A protein has these predicted regions:
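C-terminal outer-membrane beta-barrel translocator/porin domains of Gram-negative envelope proteins
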Residues: 1-118, 124-130, 134
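Outer-membrane beta-barrel "beta-signal"
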Residues: 11, 91, 156-162, 176-187
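Secondary-structure boundary/capping motif
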Residues: 65-68, 114, 153, 178-182
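A short pocket-lining beta-strand/turn micro-motif at the edge of beta-sheets
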Residues: 106-108, 120-124, 150-154, 162-167, ...
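Short glycine-rich, acidic/polar surface loops and turns
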Residues: 111-113, 143-145, 153-158
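C-terminal beta-signal and adjacent terminal beta-strands/loops
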Residues: 129-149, 175, 187
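Short small-residue beta-strand/loop micro-motif enriched in glycine and branched aliphatics
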Residues: 135-137, 165-168
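Short, exposed beta-strand-loop hairpins at the edges of beta-sheets
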Residues: 170-173
């Protein structure tokens, strides 16, 4: 698998979003579908189709308690660069694992979070993440072993709402115990 070359592509995305708040949703859903086509005909070095679907669902439980669920799936057909593979691991997908630890042409993932108030503008989070990537041809990435097994983690986190957006600190227990600090919402 070559990581050098030009990727030229078109992407079509459709999004339905009725969440009550972009940064800290307590009800509603966001559902998105994306289809990407890249090809030599566009002047690129890779011919591929990439399909991605994601659903985010939020349920207010009362008194500031929220249940949030994210489901994702994806499929790539054709030849893509290493950088265009699906990846899981790190603060946005599988907390408790290294960033982009898992790569593949096929992917599914899920996150379930229970969010609860601690103080004004401070929220606690209990979470579990699960997912898998696979579908890389044997030997395409010499140092990578394709593995379709389910990887999962559990953890706790804290959210601080600031004027410039949310700040997140999560501790995930996966194959490693790892802290993740980041800005913005995970989902």
């Amino acid at each position: 698998m070559d990581n050098f070359g030009t990727t030229n592509s078109f992407t079509f995305t459709h999004v339905f979003d009725n969440r009550d708040n972009y940064f800290n949703a307590s009800k509603g859903r966001r559902i998105s579908f994306a289809a990407q086509w890249g090809g030599h005909g566009l002047g690129g070095d890779y011919d591929f189709y990439k399909f991605t679907a994601e659903g985010r669902f939020y349920k207010a439980l009362g008194n500031g308690h929220i249940l949030a669920l994210r489901l994702m799936g994806g499929y790539i057909d054709g030849d893509v660069s290493y950088g265009n593979l699906f990846d899981l691991g790190g603060s946005d997908t599988l907390r408790g694992y290294e960033d982009d630890q898992f790569k593949g042409k096929k992917m599914y993932a899920a996150t379930l979070e229970y969010r609860f108030p601690i103080a004004k503008k401070v929220q606690g989070v209990l979470f579990t993440d699960a997912g898998s990537t696979w579908g890389i041809d044997e030997g395409k990435i010499p140092w990578y072993t394709d593995d379709d097994s389910l990887n999962w983690s559990v953890g706790v986190g804290i959210r601080l709402q600031t004027p410039i957006g949310p700040i997140r600190l999560d501790y995930g227990h996966g194959d490693r115990n790892k802290f993740n600090f980041s800005f913005g919402t995970q989902f």
